[in-house]
Amino acid sequence: MERITVTLGERSYPISIASGLFSQEAAFWPLRSGEQAMLVTNETLAKLYLAPVQRTLERAGVRVGQVILPDGEQFKSLSVLERVFSALLENNHGRDTTLVALGGGVIGDLIGFAAACYQRGVRFIQVPTTLLAQVDSSVGGKTAVNHPLGKNMIGAFYQPASVTIDIDCLQTLPLRELASGLAEVIKYGIIMDADFFRWLETQMDALLRLEPSALVYCIRRCCELKAQVVAEDEREQGRRALLNLGHTFGHAIEAEMGYGNWLHGEAVAAGTMMAARVACRLGYLQPQQAERMSALLTRAGLPVQGPAGMIPDAYLPHMLRDKKVLGGTLRLVLPTAIGSAEVFAGVSHDVVRDAIADCLA
């Protein structure tokens, strides 16, 4: 088993990565015999993993309830959050309960926010089942639900007690969802680690074949990089903003197209190339480096162009609601080379429009 620690003083927590963790009682630390937990998942995953995880927890002596939610980004909402609160209250869960988020980014974000709010804060465990959640959203304490006017606009920073990553989940992941997760994987190479980017260029086929050794290394490296950034900048006042490469454009795509029509990673991939084209237009990034980014995203099965029919002017209203906007000024994460990125403020809207146009189908 690989184990990484997110170092945040008394709120530090472990990330465990291995095959077969769902059958191991110790993988769901810090739950102990006699404690109460609410296991939350979606309708799709319930058929695959709810029973084995519940059996493992019950074998450990944990009293387990369950909530099964509808599957999809459109259900990451306040109304679904209320369903979780109702289930907790109706089943007499107190401040000593633990929420177990068994699912991808939607379940993890929503249940993390539920944990932050319920009785002013209860413990929760992230059990990510998609590559995207395993390498990104389950680590770092960002929790939220969506609003019709913007993605992740209602949320909190609230760290899990632990993260349990069983790579066997990826065997049942649709290829499109796997590719979506690879967008976040590639992002780490672009913004932080040129050696990892080069490794991805040589190992992409192995990842797409779900070779266990490649998956474990990939997930571990991403979690190491994320843990390092979160330890330095938990609340996104500085360096952590770099993890949002492609997200300002990507969130605009998701909001405009309707949540769930473009997967998050697909929107981030197209947004990453839009950010790269902005950087090229401003002279911060060499065009051949942008082409390497585009080539790797394409090999992963990801789009490098925006949605057909979404004109450049449709992006800006959404982008100006981005959480990185300060004083009405657009701030963008732009790659400056493979392995490095910076936040730039005051980028001309005309340059942004032109870069988006460069990436239209």
From Swiss-Prot:
Keyword Cell inner membrane: no
Named cofactor requirement(s): Co(2+); Zn(2+); NAD(+)
SUPFAM superfamilies to which the protein is assigned, alphabetical: Dehydroquinate synthase-like
Gene Ontology biological-process entries: amino acid biosynthetic process; aromatic amino acid family biosynthetic process; chorismate biosynthetic process
Enzyme Commission number(s) of this protein: 4.2.3.4
NCBIfam families given in the database record: aroB
Family: Belongs to the sugar phosphate cyclases superfamily. Dehydroquinate synthase family.
Residues that hold Zn(2+) according to the record: 184, 247, 264
Pathway: Metabolic intermediate biosynthesis; chorismate biosynthesis; chorismate from D-erythrose 4-phosphate and phosphoenolpyruvate: step 2/7
Organism: Edwardsiella ictaluri (strain 93-146)
Record: residues binding NAD(+): 71-76, 105-109, 129-130, 142, 151, 169-172
Major localization listed first in the record, in broad terms: cytoplasm
Compartment(s) where it occurs, according to its Swiss-Prot or TrEMBL record: Cytoplasm
One example GO MF annotation: metal ion binding
Keywords of this entry: Amino-acid biosynthesis, Aromatic amino acid biosynthesis, Cobalt, Cytoplasm, Lyase, Metal-binding, NAD, Nucleotide-binding, Zinc
UniProt protein name: 3-dehydroquinate synthase
Enzyme class: lyase
Keyword Nucleotide-binding: yes
Taxonomic placement: Bacteria, Pseudomonadati, Pseudomonadota, Gammaproteobacteria, Enterobacterales
GO annotation, cellular component aspect: cytoplasm
Catalytic activity of the protein: 7-phospho-2-dehydro-3-deoxy-D-arabino-heptonate = 3-dehydroquinate + phosphate
